[in-house]
């Protein structure tokens, strides 16, 4: 068993987030990402952050944004987070919760397209 380099608090927060997923994240996880041939992890620690969904083979982070992300301070935090993730070689794509709830097929298609592009298929 590999030893984690993440703080116990971060790991506990990730577990809690996996248990209490918002409706859009739950829908994308169970009805969308599970249909793809690529392996995704949900609520995955990366550095000091917990990303919504992570595909290791493509080094892709998928983030879902609810209404709280409309706030200027939240947008600034998202920008810093994205810059950090970019700096460690990860690409970040974002979707609004509304898009997942109203156009799941389109969101999943785009995620699959980006994964395939990044892994060269």
List the model feature ranges, each with a label.
Residues 1-121:
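Nucleic-acid endo/exonuclease domains
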């Amino acid at each position: 068993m590999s030893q984690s380099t993440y703080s116990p608090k971060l790991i506990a927060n990730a577990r809690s987030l996996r248990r209490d997923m918002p409706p859009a994240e739950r829908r994308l996880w169970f009805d969308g990402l599970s249909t793809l041939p690529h392996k995704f992890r949900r609520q995955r620690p990366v550095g000091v952050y917990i990303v919504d969904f992570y595909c290791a083979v493509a080094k892709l982070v998928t983030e879902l944004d609810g209404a709280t992300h409309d706030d200027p301070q939240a947008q600034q935090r998202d920008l810093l987070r994205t810059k950090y993730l970019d700096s460690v070689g990860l690409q970040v794509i974002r979707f609004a919760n509304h898009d997942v709830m109203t156009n799941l097929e389109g969101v999943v298609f785009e995620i699959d397209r980006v994964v395939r592009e990044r892994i060269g298929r």
